């Protein structure tokens, strides 16, 4: 079965192919004989009630100096026999939401969207973990700086995050006795106007912030522990963390079993769970990463698992 695979992503010319999960997906789709189409950034539209996109034929190759070739752009109407990989990075701002609404129209026309556009709108990556409270550390989400401060003082040390960030940006560790706590909370809440997440600090972060990948609700057998370096407490690779592959622990599998069935039910075929120690901290649904690192360390083909699920869905 040959499919038209349409990718919505950040500019392909700027990716780092050694680490880019979307690139791994494109390589696998091409290997299977599917036709690749690249959506011009900002190229999704609605025309007379139909979802359309400005796309160009795309070919990819494992060459760090010349990894893609594009043909001429033309308008494509979405419909059956198409798979759309929605792989734009956060922030999930108004333009991102509008794109998911266009993709919902494409879905109704018969295209398969990965991940489900309604799910992308519903699941904030920081808040989605709280749908599984049995998996999470003590957490408070509030605009009230005084309440957030009381939470920090109650737990001694806490991590403070905005709800719309990625890659470890604007994440603070603070605690009782920190002279900067008030200004951190003023900044994150924008004077009690923006929801901010406070989470009890988990000392196990020194052993790594684990990324567990779910494909169609089932966990990959290995995770990537992103280990903070030096005096940094953030393990994110974008913040300088070192990636180390590990087999899943029993607790990791338990967490995956709590989250996976709901993700599959909602059409979230490719999801990244962030786990520190025994606790789930985030559920990443927009553009989860770490496929390339895990494939390289363990000889896996995680994108192959994803396309097995996609092809099974297309055959129904």
Curated annotation (Swiss-Prot):
<keyword id="KW-0479">Metal-binding</keyword>
<feature type="binding site">
    <location>
        <position position="284"/>
    </location>
    <ligand>
        <name>Mg(2+)</name>
    </ligand>
</feature>
<keyword id="KW-0464">Manganese</keyword>
<protein>
    <recommendedName>
        <fullName>Glutathione synthetase</fullName>
        <ecNumber>6.3.2.3</ecNumber>
    </recommendedName>
</protein>
<comment type="pathway">
    <text>Sulfur metabolism; glutathione biosynthesis; glutathione from L-cysteine and L-glutamate: step 2/2.</text>
</comment>
<keyword id="KW-0067">ATP-binding</keyword>
<keyword id="KW-0317">Glutathione biosynthesis</keyword>
<dbReference type="GO" id="GO:0005524">
    <property type="term" value="F:ATP binding"/>
</dbReference>
<feature type="binding site">
    <location>
        <begin position="151"/>
        <end position="208"/>
    </location>
    <ligand>
        <name>ATP</name>
    </ligand>
</feature>
<dbReference type="Pfam" id="PF02955">
    <property type="entry name" value="GSH-S_ATP"/>
</dbReference>
<comment type="similarity">
    <text>Belongs to the prokaryotic GSH synthase family.</text>
</comment>
<dbReference type="InterPro" id="IPR006284">
    <property type="entry name" value="Glut_synth_pro"/>
</dbReference>
<dbReference type="Pfam" id="PF02951">
    <property type="entry name" value="GSH-S_N"/>
</dbReference>
<dbReference type="GO" id="GO:0004363">
    <property type="term" value="F:glutathione synthase activity"/>
</dbReference>
<dbReference type="InterPro" id="IPR016185">
    <property type="entry name" value="PreATP-grasp_dom_sf"/>
</dbReference>
<feature type="domain" description="ATP-grasp">
    <location>
        <begin position="124"/>
        <end position="311"/>
    </location>
</feature>
<dbReference type="GO" id="GO:0046872">
    <property type="term" value="F:metal ion binding"/>
</dbReference>
<keyword id="KW-0547">Nucleotide-binding</keyword>
<keyword id="KW-0436">Ligase</keyword>
<feature type="binding site">
    <location>
        <position position="282"/>
    </location>
    <ligand>
        <name>Mg(2+)</name>
    </ligand>
</feature>
<dbReference type="InterPro" id="IPR013815">
    <property type="entry name" value="ATP_grasp_subdomain_1"/>
</dbReference>
<dbReference type="GO" id="GO:0005737">
    <property type="term" value="C:cytoplasm"/>
</dbReference>
<dbReference type="InterPro" id="IPR004215">
    <property type="entry name" value="GSHS_N"/>
</dbReference>
<dbReference type="InterPro" id="IPR004218">
    <property type="entry name" value="GSHS_ATP-bd"/>
</dbReference>
<dbReference type="InterPro" id="IPR011761">
    <property type="entry name" value="ATP-grasp"/>
</dbReference>
<keyword id="KW-0460">Magnesium</keyword>
């Amino acid at each position: 079965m040959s499919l038209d695979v349409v990718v919505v992503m950040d500019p392909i010319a700027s990716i780092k192919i050694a680490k880019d999960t979307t690139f791994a997906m494109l390589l696998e789709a091409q290997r299977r004989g599917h036709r690749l189409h690249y959506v011009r950034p900002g190229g999704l539209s609605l025309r007379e009630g139909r979802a359309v996109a400005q796309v160009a034929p795309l070919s990819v190759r494992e060459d760090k100096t010349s990894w893609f070739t594009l043909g001429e752009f033309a308008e494509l109407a979405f419909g059956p026999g198409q798979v759309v990989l929605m792989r734009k990075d956060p922030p999930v701002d108004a333009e991102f939401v509008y794109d998911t609404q266009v993709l919902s129209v494409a879905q109704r026309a018969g295209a398969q969207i990965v991940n489900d556009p309604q799910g992308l709108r519903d699941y904030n990556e920081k808040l989605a973990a709280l749908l599984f409270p049995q998996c999470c550390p003590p957490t408070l989400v509030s605009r009230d700086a005084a309440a957030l401060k009381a939470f920090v003082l109650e737990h001694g040390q806490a991590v403070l995050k905005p709800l719309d960030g990625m890659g470890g940006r604007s994440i603070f560790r603070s605690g009782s006795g920190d002279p900067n706590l008030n200004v951190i909370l003023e900044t994150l809440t924008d004077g009690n106007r923006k929801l901010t997440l406070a989470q009890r600090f988990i000392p196990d972060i020194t052993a790594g912030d684990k990324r567990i990948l779910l494909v169609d609700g089932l966990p990959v057998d290995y995770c990537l522990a992103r280990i903070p370096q030096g005096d940094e407490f953030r393990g994110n690779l974008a913040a300088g963390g070192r990636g180390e592959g590990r087999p899943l622990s029993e607790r990791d599998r338990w967490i995956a079993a709590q989250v996976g069935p709901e993700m599959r039910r909602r059409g979230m075929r490719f999801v990244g769970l962030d786990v520190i120690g025994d606790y789930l901290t985030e559920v990443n649904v927009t553009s989860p990463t770490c496929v390339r690192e895990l494939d390289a360390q363990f000889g896996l083909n995680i994108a192959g698992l994803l396309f097995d699920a996609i092809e099974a869905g297309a055959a129904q």
